[in-house]
Amino acid sequence: EDFANLITVVCQTSKGAKTLSGTLFAKNDPRLVRLDEYTFDARPMGHMLFYVNDDKPGIIGRIGTVMGNHRVNIAQMSCGRHEMGGRALTILNVDSEIPPEVIETLLAQDFIAWARQVSL
């Protein structure tokens, strides 16, 4: 990676290690740029949804439909993958807290490996 400044945190859990990296753009614009093997560019703010999905056409639209059906507005989106057709990480910044039933609906989809809401 080519960052002037990069902070990386490694957390050890019972399920293994997780690595998260962040940086500052233009000296005052914080960004998350890596989670494990996925690279992306996401603003760490407000309510966020992190999920890993199959990397194939139509997935983003299906997620948007689920969010829209539950009146959750997507403000920003960032995606990262390491190979075409494999798995992709998507980070959504949303305008409000995501109801638990939305997460349950997403996790019930066969193309979603995992999904977590983060509120900062």
Residue ranges with predicted function:
Residues 1-120:
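A conserved regulatory-domain signal marking ACT and ACT-like small-molecule sensing domains
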